[in-house]
From Swiss-Prot:
Pfam families: NADH_dehy_S2_C, Proton_antipo_M. It is found in: Mitochondrion inner membrane. Belongs to the complex I subunit 2 family. Its EC number is 7.1.1.2. This is NADH-ubiquinone oxidoreductase chain 2. It comes from Dasypus novemcinctus (Nine-banded armadillo). Core subunit of the mitochondrial membrane respiratory chain NADH dehydrogenase (Complex I) which catalyzes electron transfer from NADH through the respiratory chain, using ubiquinone as an electron acceptor. Essential for the catalytic activity and assembly of complex I. It catalyses: a ubiquinone + NADH + 5 H(+)(in) = a ubiquinol + NAD(+) + 4 H(+)(out). GO terms for cellular component: mitochondrial inner membrane; respiratory chain complex I. The lineage of its organism: Eukaryota, Metazoa, Chordata, Craniata, Vertebrata.
Length: 347
């Protein structure tokens, strides 16, 4: 891709998200989402391949449907209230329509089918943008309208997302699909807590973004896309593989790593609100995610992979071109747990 065109596309992508995040007018918010969507399509199609074309088509159809549903909700709300402002309380019909539209944009279950397919059809860099930056605009809208949303609908979407995110990743061998299902599960945790504590949702989002960017940065650095190629990285880049596997454990929410902190605080907050069954169910379902992360770690570092590893240990390891800020991201993705008391005070 021409560097100038790439810069314009990236600028439009960032501008679209920023417009959505700072606007209080529904028309501007919708315009920002559209800019975001149309700039993401060429990023997905950056590699000229039938899989990337298919992924871009699926992404466009899903996002266009969600945008249409969101605009329909905005128009109905305008008809009843006569106002375009986002701070205005929504009527029940509009609330349901907007929740479903934003669930489609975020990839929440049962509107999740496009996320693994689109992520698998793109390059690692495009997949990273899709699972991190593209979550910001819809989550900002949810943050602003959370008081008008239906609690039962949000909790249903959250439980389904955590369940599907765990089940879907169990039989996967492609790392991009595993990351996609992990994203669905994490979005479920954020959706569950947004109705009770928006600060916790933001904290969860920030930690999720750090862990996901770290994982993709390490995948890009080691050119790893499957569980088989991941098992072979141990021979050439053992330090990088160790960091990758530690970040995987953090992504699964294993204490004492960073990923445990948001889950711990979400369960605590929901228990304070006299909800015991729901956080217990969420914690049990999160074990599915941890299981397939542990399976990756087991096959990579503790045993030989089912196919014989013929790669010999090298006397001189590869010189890795580290992505900028990788050491910082790895540290933040794995060692934030001592700051948890401070986070609890802030919340």
């Amino acid at each position: 891709m021409n560097p100038l065109i790439f810069i314009i596309i990236m600028f439009t992508l960032i501008l679209g998200t920023v417009i959505t995040m700072i606007s209080s007018h529904w028309l501007l918010i919708w315009m920002g989402l559209e800019m975001n969507m149309f700039s993401m399509i060429p990023i997905i199609m950056m590699k000229s391949h039938p899989r990337s074309t298919e992924a871009a088509t699926k992404y466009f159809m899903t996002q266009a449907t969600a945008s249409m549903l969101l605009m329909m909700g905005v128009i109905i709300n305008l008809y009843y209230s006569g106002q375009w402002t986002i701070m205005n309380s929504l009527n029940p019909v509009t609330s349901y329509m907007m929740t479903i539209a934003l669930a489609m944009k975020l990839g929440l279950a049962p509107f999740h089918f496009w996320v693994p397919e689109v992520t698998q059809g793109t390059q690692l860099t495009s997949g990273m943008i899709l699972l991190t930056w593209q979550k910001l605009a819809p989550m900002t809208i949810l943050y602003q309208i959370h008081s008008s949303l239906n609690l039962n609908l949000m909790l249903t979407l959250a439980i389904l997302s955590i369940l599907i995110g765990g089940w879907g990743g169990l039989n996967q061998t492609q790392l991009r699909k595993i990351m996609a299902y992990s994203s669905i599960a994490h979005m479920g945790w954020m959706t569950a807590i947004i109705m009770y504590n928006t600060s916790l949702m933001m904290l969860n989002l920030v930690i999720y973004l750090m862990m996901t960017i770290t994982m993709f940065a390490l995948f890009i650095n080691s050119t790893t896309t499957t569980t088989l190629s991941l098992s072979l990285t141990w021979n050439s880049t053992p330090i990088l593989t160790t960091m990758l596997l530690t970040t995987l454990l953090s992504l699964g929410g294993l204490p004492p790593l960073s990923g445990f902190a948001p889950k711990w605080m979400i369960i605590q907050e929901m228990t304070k609100n006299n909800m015991l069954l729901l956080p217990t169910t969420m914690a049990i379902m999160a074990l599915l995610n941890l299981y397939f992360y542990m399976r990756l770690i087991y096959s990579t570092s503790l045993t030989m992979f089912p196919t014989t590893n013929n790669n010999k240990m090298k006397w001189k390891y590869k010189t890795q071109n580290f992505i900028p800020l990788s050491p910082t991201l790895i540290t933040l993705s794995t060692m934030l747990i001592p700051l948890t008391p401070m986070m609890l005070i802030l919340n």
